[in-house]
Amino acid sequence: MKRLNTVLKEDGVQTDLILLIRTILATSKEIAFRVSQGELAGVLGSTLNENIQGEVQKKLDVIANQLLKDILLDDNSVRTVASEEEDHAVGANPEGKFIVAFDPLDGSSNIDVNGQIGTIFTIYLARDDVPYDSDEQFNQLGANQVCAGYVLYGPSSLLVMSTGGPTRCYTLDSTHGGYLLTNNQLSVPEQSSEFAVNMANYRYWDEPTQVYFDKLLYTCKSFDKSSVRWNAAMVGDVHRILCRGGLFLYPQDNRAGNENGKIRLLYEANPLALLVENAGGKATSKGARILDIAPTNLHQRVPVVLGSIAPAEYFNSTVYNSNAKY
């Protein structure tokens, strides 16, 4: 099996980007160890604080955020850092080439029940037309990402990443401490009958979205064998879709704060959209390509539909009267 470093060099990835990726992944190994220790390491439970999203922070959320932030701020190639757990961007080296955004632990509600959780990250080239430490550094289209990936912590720790080419999967070799290539090209099947959606939110959705799920569950013969899988961790649901197909949906709803969806564009929707597209799937928001959405703020939320092409287009045609071709 090939080591990550070898694969990246064969893909023609520049040395400075390879080194930055390795920096991020060094921290992922520490997070993986702490996750595996659980209560033995005293990392379970919540703090008394809330993040900017209004969510109570888990202890492991805070630890993972601090580990990633500290190592990135100490990296001379990094100009600015953004995190789900930070109100604003944090400046690093004013001359740094890259900016990095991350969700330190996606699915943090699963921490205390030993469920699926993961770290999502994305890397862009820094902008020279705005202050180095400003939120505006991240006002870039998702299509501009030079690297996107996640580490899924579970029975084995998996890295799924793309540097613009294929979406590949690596497994952490805990014996030697390196990530080894275990799937050279993840490919999302065009058709699938599996769906990742929180059906408890049905009563909050608008009528077109409800109609879609009514058709899906009761009248559409194309999906008469459909089944729902829901991990309460986007990173876990998307990983399953990358491996065997399906559709992840988190529509907007009529609850206060969810009018524009719940998934954060910068460090959740964009990196996962890039991974899904580069695996042959589709990723849209209100019928438009996610990677073409112009961001307006650091923690902007968007409704998300991503995964297998056929059910994604069926959703868009039903709800938005659009095939969202691209």
Curated annotation (Swiss-Prot):
Q: Which locations, inside or outside the cell, does it occupy?
A: Cytoplasm
Q: What is its EC number?
A: 3.1.3.11
Going by the entry's taxonomy, the superkingdom of the source organism is recorded as: Bacteria
Q: Provide the Gene Ontology terms for cellular component.
A: cytosol
From the Swiss-Prot or TrEMBL record, what is one GO molecular function term? magnesium ion binding
User: Matching CDD domains, A to Z?
Assistant: FBPase (cd00354)
Keyword list, A-Z: Carbohydrate metabolism, Cytoplasm, Hydrolase, Magnesium, Metal-binding
Quote the pathway field. Carbohydrate biosynthesis; gluconeogenesis
- Reactions that this protein is recorded to catalyse: beta-D-fructose 1,6-bisphosphate + H2O = beta-D-fructose 6-phosphate + phosphate
GO biological process terms, semicolon-separated = fructose 1,6-bisphosphate metabolic process; fructose 6-phosphate metabolic process; fructose metabolic process; gluconeogenesis; sucrose biosynthetic process
The entry's Mg(2+) 2-binding residues are D103, D106, E268
Family according to the record:
Belongs to the FBPase class 1 family.
Specify the protein name: Fructose-1,6-bisphosphatase class 1 2
Per the record, the gene is fbp2
